[in-house]
Amino acid sequence: MMPSSFGAIDQPVSRIKEESLMSAPAVPDRFTTLPDEHALQATVVALEEHGFSVEVVDDLDAARQAVLARIPEGSSVMTNTSVTLAETGIADAIDHGGDRWESARNKMFALDFATQGQEMKAIAGQPDYALGSVHAVTRDGTLVIASASGSQLASYAWGAANVIFVVGAQKLVPGLAAAHERIYQHSLPLEDVRAQAAYGQHSQVGKVLEIHQELPGRIHIVLIRQSVGF
């Protein structure tokens, strides 16, 4: 698929993240500060009240183990472009870990976007499991995800049978205003640097998805007690 940044369906981030972040702009500490235990637990309760299931883990290894344990063998799995999925090793485990799961990403990129673009979109948009992260989680239980192209948003909102979000606890914010501040003042500047290193182009906020409510059982959140991702 044509390159498009900010969590869109494109190339893996692990190869260029270290190089790109060497020139990343400074961002306010409030966007990377971990919440206290009271705020974390209050957010978990709010998320559960809105139909999301949540588990809290201590580190990146535990997050990877938690995610992989939830995915039945043979499932089609789309690893949407995510610094968090790269840092936890989840993307590599799915896309380069053998034949335990069907990598929707690998299947998609075996096709030609110029002649098979719609088929590629169908593969990415309707997997058994869509994996990714979010840019903010509000205290009252809303998930906020920004994207340049919106290519991953369809699977999150409707297309995927199951969705698993892996989220660093630093992304917890008081409300929607703070969520949008975090996107524009923190996530976008960092993603812009990454996009220039990966694709030679700037990023942008083209679309923003807010998930306020979900039918129980479809969206699972693995919340990490560490700062990870943008």
Model regions and ranges:
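Conserved phosphate- and dinucleotide-binding cores of soluble alpha/beta proteins
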Residues: 124-230
